[in-house]
């Protein structure tokens, strides 16, 4: 059900936050909203030089592949834009910025299997994709 799905997601974010703390990250915000966009976890390292924006995806089983495969280009774009608002809002322009994903497979009963991908995507990969799409559109006007 949707309620169970949301509960699993909340549990997954909790596991991700605990994991990041254990690695020495300080959790600044969880579920930070800007308009209709949001970012699951914003964390910063101990000397405040790197800020990470983390998208967490949780699935009860791994049978459909890695949970973070669900983070499509549109979602990546949304996270990058939200991060920009966050950085301006909290005056973090001096920080290095990184976009990470954390995939969680499991349930409260089975425990969490955690996969943390650092630098999972960035602005450069987004720009490359946009150029690629524009090129394809010019080549095949009939199909769009």
What are these regions (language model features)?
Residues 1-31, 110:
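Acidic-basic catalytic patches of nuclease active cores, encompassing PD-(D/E)XK
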Residues 3, 7, 11, 36, ...:
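Residues at secondary-structure transition points
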Residues 20, 39-43, 48-62, 79:
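Conserved catalytic cores of phosphodiester-cleaving nucleases, focusing on short active-site segments
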Residues 23-24, 35-39, 97:
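Short beta-strand or tight-loop elements
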Residues 35, 46-48, 109-110:
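Short strand-connecting beta-turns/loops that link adjacent beta-strands
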Residues 58-108:
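Catalytic cores of nucleic-acid endonucleases
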Residues 89-144:
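Domain-level recognition of nuclease-like catalytic cores that cleave nucleotide substrates
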């Amino acid at each position: 059900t949707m309620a169970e799905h949301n509960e699993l997601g909340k549990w997954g974010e909790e596991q991700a936050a605990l994991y990041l703390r254990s690695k020495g990250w300080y959790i600044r915000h969880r579920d930070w909203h800007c308009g209709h966009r949001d970012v699951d976890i914003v964390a910063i390292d101990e000397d405040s030089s790197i800020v990470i924006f983390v998208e967490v995806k949780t699935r009860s089983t791994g049978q459909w592949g890695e949970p973070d495969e669900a983070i499509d280009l549109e979602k990546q774009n949304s996270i990058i834009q939200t991060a920009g608002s966050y950085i301006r809002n909290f005056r973090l322009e001096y920080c290095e910025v990184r976009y990470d994903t954390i995939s969680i497979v499991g349930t409260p009963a089975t425990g969490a299997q955690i996969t943390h991908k650092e630098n999972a995507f960035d602005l450069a990969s987004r720009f490359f994709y946009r150029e690629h799409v524009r090129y394809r559109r010019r080549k095949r006007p009939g199909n769009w």
